[in-house]
Amino acid sequence: DPELAETMPQKLVAHTGMDAMTHAIEAYVSTANCDFTDPLALHAIKMIQRDLVGSYEGDMEKRDNMHNAQCLAGMAFSNALLGIVHSMAHKTGAAFADYGAHIIHGAANAMYLPKVIAFNAKDPVAKERYGEIADFMKLGGSTDDEKISLLIDYLRGMNDALNIPHCIKNYGADSYPTEEGFVPEDVFLERLPEIAANAILDACT
C-alpha cells in the first residue's frame, strides 16, 4: 500500500531509496543472478534512477513508484542474494555507537556502493555486469571502464542530491554530510580489522 509511504521523513526516503538501489545493483551482479532476477533488478534500477530524487523532494506519484521499485528490488535480491556492500553496512551500523551515533543502514549502503563497484570491477564478469547496468541507465561510455566510471559518478551525484555523505569521515551524527564526522579517524582505523572480519562472516558475503 503506497499510502503507507506518504508521510515518510525526507531522510528516510533518501536512505531507503539508496538501500533499494543497492539491493538491485548487488542482485544483478551477484554470482547467483539468473534469468528470473535480472529483469526485476534492472527495472528496479531504472525506476529508482527516474523517481528517487523526485520522491525525496515530495512528489507523491514518484513516492508511489518508488514503493513498487523497492518491492521489485526486494524480489530480485531475495532470489539472487546480495554482496559485500550490505555485509559492511550490517557490521558498521552500531560499531561506533559509543561515540554517540549510528551509521544508518541505507546511508551506509549509499556510501559504500560506489567504492565496492570500483573494487569489484577488477573481476571481468562483474565489470561486464556493471557495464550492462550503465547501458540500461543510458549513462554513456564506449568501454566498460568508461561506463563504470560514469555509473560511480552517477551514484555519487545521487548521494549529493539526497544529502548523503560520501564516506564515514564526513558522516555527521545526524547522518548528514559534515566536514568532520562523528567517528574519529584513529578510532575507525583501530576497529577496521574487526569490522572487516565480521563483514566476511556476514550472510551477504
Regions found by a protein language model. Name each.
Residues 1-33, 128-132:
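A glycine/threonine-rich phosphate-anchoring loop and its flanking beta-alpha core
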Residues 24, 28, 51, 55, ...:
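A short secondary-structure junction motif
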Residues 27-154:
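Active-site segments that bind and position negatively charged phosphate/pyrophosphate groups
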